[in-house]
Amino acid sequence: MRIAVACSGLDVAYRFDHAENFTLYTVTNGIIVECQSLPYPSVPQPAIVDFFKSMDVVALICNTINIEDARYYCNADIEVVAAVSGIARTAVEQYLTKTLIGADEMCHWDDDDDDFPGEHTCHL
């Protein structure tokens, strides 16, 4: 599996839509085994989501992200982990620790949004 982080250099970008690059971490048996940095592409979000799905990305870590962008990932079964700052690798390690020990998710999606039936709401 892979985890994508929206970055500015080696740090989690403050704003998802202003990220300079995505860092993709390959994880095997809970251990980071590879890291690749890709420039942030100037293509529509659905194309990025399709690319991430083809690369087996299961989570996107970012700081701030607008709900429309987050929905693309959520609808593709890519977990969005928002409100994260600091060094990208540290964020991935913390995500893995929380996931592997069964702690609460940093961000989860509620499928029962009363305002918009059938849509997902991010709860931090």
Please provide the spans of the model-predicted regions.
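Glycine-centered small-residue hotspots that permit tight backbone geometry or close packing
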Residues: N63-T64, G86
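Short, glycine/polar-rich helix-capping loops at beta-to-alpha or helix-loop-helix junctions
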Residues: I65-A70
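Conserved SAM-binding loop
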Residues: I61-C62, V80
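Non-catalytic interface/targeting segments
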Residues: M1-V43, A47, F51-M55, N75, ...
